[in-house]
Amino acid sequence: MPLLIDRPVFIMAAPRSCSTLLFETMSRSAHLWSIGDESHQLIEQFPPLNPLAEADSNRVTAEPLQGAIGEELGRSLRRAFALNLRDREGARPPPEGSVRLLEKTPKNALRIPFLAALYPDALFIHLVRDPKENIASIIDAWRSRRFVTYPTIATANGPWSLLLPPGWRDRLEAPLEEVAAFQWQAANQHILDDLAAIPRERRCTLNASELLADPRAVAERLCRFIDIPMDEEFASGLMQPLPLSMYTLHAPRPDKWRRHGGALQRVWPRIAPLIDRLNASLDAGTPALDAAGPPPDAVVASPDEAERHHDPHSEMGDVGRNSPCPCGSGRRFKACHGRLT
């Protein structure tokens, strides 16, 4: 009998929702397997799932799995996941038996009907983050040029970054804060709508603030939900502070969003109704999101001030000075965004 992926676990979240931190934390369990990173290429190698081929966006329903061609697509994708599985030590699974897959890719927020058809026993974790922090982080991600997903899609804000929701063509010339709010809103709206069709026992919600405040308690809760034991090595590792995730742009700071205060104020009326709906969907005991918009006295830096105080090293991460600049200019980092001043 070939290797079976039993009750895979999908983390569903808008981009920049601390989903990588949650994925890296739970990947330390001896009872979970993953492909080690996000599954962009693994999924989008199939034309019906690729916006640059046959798909129009990252939104995918169960339709591509229908018919004989769809059945073959499903088998091929399940095989691709199985062939790329690794445990926390990087070891391959045995050729037979069953394993539990942990998967996290923000684009999957738009693919729940597809994933539920691909794996009818799948479990889903909906991770939410404070909207001010989340949308501000999406803005930072676009500006960093480290999260470009579709380089051939040109926008007023540079090549398209992060997930590609339906309606993206209408935002090609939009201000960056509108694009960021659009991505946050589309991801969470589709998650809420699609998870409503999933049995209650196969889904749960989590606020990123819980993970940051008490990772041990969150891990214990998720192990119960996933139905796996917490092994001793996993538990002992959670006694230490969580490290920064691999995709962290800036060191965490509670008021970091304030530098985008003016931008957030402009988009807040549009997203406020969804915040109320998200709060209504949270599991009992899950902290609610702050529905209050940025206060009038939020620190708002003008573009010139932001540029003067901009630290390229914090945006670009750990880049060698002789490496190509991540901004895509073609120049070395030391001669571009890494220039010493």
Task: Give the location of each predicted region.
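PAPS-dependent sulfotransferase catalytic core
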Residues: 1-86, 155, 241-242, 247, ...
